[in-house]
Amino acid sequence: MKFLTPSDAEQAFYEAFEIGEITAMMAVWSKDDDITCIHPHGPRLIGRSAIEASWRDILNASIGVRFQLTEIREFVDQALAVRVLYENLWVPGENSPRPPIIATNAYRYSKSGWHMVLHHASPMPQDDPENRGAAVFH
């Protein structure tokens, strides 16, 4: 599938997640094997095989989830786009969303359009540093 913009690819990514469709999910990912995925509290997964296996397990267990994406920040040039956002996740049977997940999604442009090369998702810290002002960690 050809995605004309990084936003198109990202929309398809979250739609595939919501409907639990592995074929649609993997259509978003680059066909190259130099792709990486890090799920919350998970190890670094490299390559289509490892990433597809992880998504197959997640999608089988996540039917009916819904996302609201907020505070999207985007950095784009001609060949690479990085989007940082909050994933607000609603699970069937629960009355309120789960605590937000902070996600970084990177997309690379090629003749076949924009495709995901990185998805890194982490739980938001209880004491979100964005609410405290700048902190120095290095």
Q: Which role fits each region the language model picked out?
A:
Residues 1-27, 34-138:
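A beta-strand edge to alpha-helix "cap/lid" segment located at domain peripheries
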